[in-house]
């Protein structure tokens, strides 16, 4: 792995922990350069990429596809429901097949935590792996677009007061962000239902009631309540959660003028955030979506750089 003039070279991208700080900042800056139209795009038509999504996705799946097409890659169609997965084929054998067919990059989302370990350790699979989200584990590309959004606003991370709020235990976004934001010098706070909080998070920040910290925050990062990962016995109604933990109009008014609101989406309106605030002046939710394309262009480019370096 290396970085020269924001041009990062990676073999795979599976977690934020695997990246150096230099690589993280290089990917953010490269995404910013793509956004500003400062990059001359090479011809990548000979490079093949497959987006293997085994969980539903709109933003991650489609922004990777847009990024790949903007870079000129050949994007292979893959529909899990119409593939041999329905005949019992394993993820490993699916990726082994795609690699054997000459696929250079597999972008994968899968419900199993750490699914990627056997893929990147395989002596036979030559395709590079980009983690588009693994269960409740990691979501590196979402984290990088979040970092770009914060950096665009403040120009730094050191000393920023950032609260990550909501369904912390089940959120791969929270885990990726807390790891790297702590490393970059941000001051982290967590809030949400106690049963959705792990003591392991104490290594990164402080668990606190939202109303104790909201006036001091620079960034409020809301998380989706992940109903699909719960057992159906959570004790909160939609209205009850919103009043106890959500961003209500009253809490919005207490934020600093310079504060920003973030959410990885999809948004449960009137649960994590009041419906009227999704596109409010302090909200950067749409900006996050847009930044996803440029960061993912930087990621795909970095993987191609790594493959060319190692070939």
From Swiss-Prot:
Amino acids binding carbamoyl phosphate: 59-60, 109, 139, 142, 265-266
NCBIfam families: asp_carb_tr (TIGR00670), PRK00856.1 (NF002032)
The gene coding this protein: pyrB
Pathway as given in its UniProt record: Pyrimidine metabolism; UMP biosynthesis via de novo pathway; (S)-dihydroorotate from bicarbonate: step 2/3
Similarity remark: Belongs to the aspartate/ornithine carbamoyltransferase superfamily. ATCase family.
GO terms under biological process: 'de novo' pyrimidine nucleobase biosynthetic process; 'de novo' UMP biosynthetic process; amino acid metabolic process
Classification of source organism: Bacteria, Bacillati, Bacillota, Bacilli, Lactobacillales
Matches recorded under Gene3D superfamilies: Aspartate/ornithine carbamoyltransferase
GO MF term set: amino acid binding; aspartate carbamoyltransferase activity
Subunit structure, as described in the record: Heterododecamer (2C3:3R2) of six catalytic PyrB chains organized as two trimers (C3), and six regulatory PyrI chains organized as three dimers (R2).
Protein name: Aspartate carbamoyltransferase catalytic subunit
């Amino acid at each position: 792995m290396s970085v020269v003039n924001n041009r990062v070279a990676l073999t795979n991208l599976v977690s934020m922990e695997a990246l150096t700080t230099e690589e993280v900042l290089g990917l953010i800056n490269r995404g910013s350069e793509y956004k500003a139209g400062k990059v001359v795009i090479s011809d990548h038509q000979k490079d093949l990429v497959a987006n293997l999504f085994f969980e539903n996705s709109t933003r991650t799946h489609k922004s990777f596809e847009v990024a790949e097409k903007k870079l000129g890659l050949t994007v292979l169609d893959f529909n899990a429901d119409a593939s041999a997965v329905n005949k019992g084929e394993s993820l490993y054998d699916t990726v082994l097949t795609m690699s054997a067919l000459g696929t250079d990059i597999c972008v994968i989302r899968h419900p199993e935590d750490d699914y990627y370990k056997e893929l990147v350790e395989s002596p036979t699979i030559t395709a590079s792996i980009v983690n588009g989200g693994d269960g409740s584990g990691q979501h590196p590309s979402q984290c990088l677009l979040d970092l770009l959004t914060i950096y665009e606003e403040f120009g730094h991370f050191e000393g920023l007061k950032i609260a990550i709020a909501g369904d912390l235990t089940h959120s791969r976004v929270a885990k990726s962000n807390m790891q790297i934001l702590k490393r970059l010098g941000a001051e982290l706070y967590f809030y949400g239902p106690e049963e959705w909080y792990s003591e392991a998070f104490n290594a990164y920040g402080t668990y606190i009631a939202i109303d104790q910290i909201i006036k001091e925050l620079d960034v409020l990062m809301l998380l989706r309540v992940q109903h699909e990962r719960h057992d159906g016995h959570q004790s909160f109604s939609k209205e009850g959660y919103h009043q106890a933990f959500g961003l209500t109009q009253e809490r919005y008014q207490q934020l600093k003028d310079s504060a920003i609101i973030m959410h990885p989406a999809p948004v449960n309106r009137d649960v994590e955030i009041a419906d009227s605030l999704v596109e409010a002046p302090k909200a950067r939710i749409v900006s996050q979506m847009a930044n996803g394309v440029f960061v993912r262009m930087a990621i795909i480019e970095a993987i191609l750089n790594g493959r060319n370096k190692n070939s």
